[in-house]
Amino acid sequence: MTVRTIEAKTLLAGHKTPDSWFGIKYTLNLYRGCQHHCIYCDSRSECYGIADFDGEVLVKANAVELLDRELRSKRVKGYVSTGAMNDPYMPVERRLGLTRRVLGVLAARRFPVHVMTKSDLVLRDLDMLGEIEAACGGVTPGAVVSITITCADDALARQLEPAAPPPSARFAAIATLAARGICAGVLLMPVLPFIEDDPENIRQIVTRAYAAGARHVIPSWGVSLRDRQREHFYAELDRRFPGVRARYEQRFGNAYSAQSPNAPALESLFTELAARFGLARTVAPYRAPGPEQLALL
């Protein structure tokens, strides 16, 4: 996979109100394209304008300087998200350390972060996450890490997310993050109909997340199906899961999204498990520490 650098004109995208699922106020993407090659990834869609999502990674070489400059004008603190259209801890990050340097800027500027990833490489940056938590935590966490886990079985995950670390490593990463006082949880999405949408898979993910110390599990009972994303996904289904594509075409046609036929049962099971384990299903928007808490920092 080719890796080359580009100069970005802007980095941060702001939202008038924080996202209701993830609590995010600002988003940024340090890379374009991704090395994990998940067969279902929505970022292949034409609307994102990434010409060669699976063949080339573009690195925003000036991201650190841009972020530092753009944060100076942001008067409202809120979670800055990494990982919306790619994984901030894809393999190239091990060598480049761009995500790590961005975390350093967030710590220095006292901005909270919500990291979304499939990789246990996030553990490399425990020290930076700890700095952000110390600088920003209080009413709500200063540093949140959500790790995507859509199936509990390592062998199945290799078919769906060929270059990402296995679920077992991701559960272990959650345990390490939680032990170090970082708010960690699971993104249980997408759940692929006819492949991952059985109750036992959901039960295992939620139970293992709780055992690892997760504070939240955010579910979605289906997958989007847009233009190039659908084409790639269906080709991979033909190669890896013969016969499943026909079930998608019969059930969903050209629909934008494919919700699992089992969604009501999965939702009922999830609600029961989340209540039993005390797991949130969203991340609340960031609330800055009050004056009395700031005095203790």
Locations of regions flagged by a protein language model:
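Auxiliary Fe-S-binding modules of radical SAM enzymes
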Residues: M1-A13, T176, F194-L297
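Short beta-strand segments at enzyme active-site cores
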Residues: V80-S81, M116, A184-L188, V217-W221
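Short, hydrophobic/aromatic alpha-helical segments in well-folded domains
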Residues: R101-V102, D125, A173, L187-V191, ...
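Conserved strand-turn element in the central/C-terminal portion of the radical SAM core barrel
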Residues: A152-L156, E161-A163, T176-D198, W221-S224
